[in-house]
């Protein structure tokens, strides 16, 4: 068994993508069907992903949008000044995130979606990260995710509420 204390945190970026109505995009993960996501089955989350070596977080968040939802139609409106960190539950240590990390430390960005819904293409990446997506109201975000990430999402709802006003 892997001891979590011996593992590092994975550096990661998260994208809270707001549409013109002030709603945010979430996607249903393809790799975790029925994993305890509270609504509609599966796990729903904002686009996010690892930061490549020699990549700055701003570049990484735009790359993740291209990879996960197939669009570059977004502009960065703001970012959290600090990083948010979560630990994986004990049952996932040594299994999730390639078994190499105890959790993630995340730099989160608020972005404005500048395209049309038809610009979102989940099949640009193979295998796709998400099999469905939807726009939701910001306050409902924490309850749409797995329990061990809810505190991060509650913090983001509070900190990014100013971006949820219609454009």
From Swiss-Prot:
CC cofactor: a divalent metal cation
Residue ranges annotated for the Nudix hydrolase domain, each copy included: 8-158
Entry EC number(s): 3.6.1.-
Gene Ontology biological-process annotations: nucleoside phosphate metabolic process; ribose phosphate metabolic process
Lineage: superkingdom: Bacteria
Enzyme class: hydrolase
One Gene Ontology MF term: guanosine-3',5'-bis(diphosphate) 3'-diphosphatase activity
UniProt KW Hydrolase keyword: yes
UniProt cross-references to Gene3D superfamilies, sorted A to Z: Nucleoside Triphosphate Pyrophosphohydrolase
One Pfam family from the record: NUDIX
Keywords: Hydrolase
Record carries keyword Hydrolase: yes
Residue numbers covered by motif Nudix box: 49-70
Protein family: Belongs to the Nudix hydrolase family. RppH subfamily.
Function statement: Accelerates the degradation of transcripts by removing pyrophosphate from the 5'-end of triphosphorylated RNA, leading to a more labile monophosphorylated state that can stimulate subsequent ribonuclease cleavage.
Stated name of the protein: RNA pyrophosphohydrolase
Organism: Gluconacetobacter diazotrophicus (strain ATCC 49037 / DSM 5601 / CCUG 37298 / CIP 103539 / LMG 7603 / PAl5)
